[in-house]
Amino acid sequence: MLPYPQIDPVAVALGPLKIHWYGLMYLIGIGGAWLLASRRLNRFDPTWSREKLSDLVFWLSMGVIVGGRLGYVLFYDLHQYLANPTLIFEVWKGGMSFHGGFIGVMLAALWFGKRNNKSFFELMDFVAPLVPIGLGAGRIGNFINAELWGKATDVPWAMVFPPFSDPAQLPRHPSQLYQFALEGVALFVILWLYSRKPRPTMAVSGMFALFYGIFRFIVEFVRVPDAQLGYIAFGWLTMGQLLCVPMIVGGIFLIWLAYNRKPTAKATV
């Protein structure tokens, strides 16, 4: 069994002002995505300035934050937030939904593309390889918060999370680290290498949806479902897995469509 590192969720405290690691992880993810996007900017569109790229990253970040929070409210704990709506704004306590953030990003990309003469999939193909940076950082934030841990296990790398998080004090799968490794590191490597060469429009987006859906679906088998939901079907299906099914199907369809429709200009990201 591995010891859980006791990390204060508050990174910096200046009097009443507290800066949480969870929030810093979002900033790291956004900053890292911007830096890598700037490296590929000329390949995407030589006419784009760094200012326009910054605008894109800003609006996509808003889509992540707003969509992620509203997605959690709608998909995972609607009853609690209807009873106490002010809790919606307490983002630093956790409670973000990737699938909600994904919808938020798509809406932001659709809006930004129309304003800047870019198609939806041009932007999504450009952005997709950058997303795992934020996903990986977010999972580290979950780990520091000692939330979203896995099922009890006797594997050598199991961890006992703090009593405030897990009163049962059982050795558990550090599922946040599994997701960091798969959704952050592995997905980044797959998409970054795949997108180094010109690909048909929609192909990179399809690869993202497919592999994220697969990785998340797998990890959900060892992750404890949200207490307020539990398993929603068959005694094993979680909300996260259910939401991944359309991503996997949609990803396969986009890849098939990208390579089987009439030839068009290649998406260079």
Swiss-Prot record:
Any one Gene Ontology cellular component term annotated for this protein: plasma membrane
Transferase keyword on record: yes
Residue sites binding a 1,2-diacyl-sn-glycero-3-phospho-(1'-sn-glycerol) per the record: 139
InterPro entries (alphabetical): Lgt
Catalytic activity, EC: 2.5.1.145
HAMAP family linked to this entry: Lgt (MF_01147)
Name under which the protein is recorded: Phosphatidylglycerol--prolipoprotein diacylglyceryl transferase
Source organism per UniProt: Pseudomonas entomophila (strain L48)
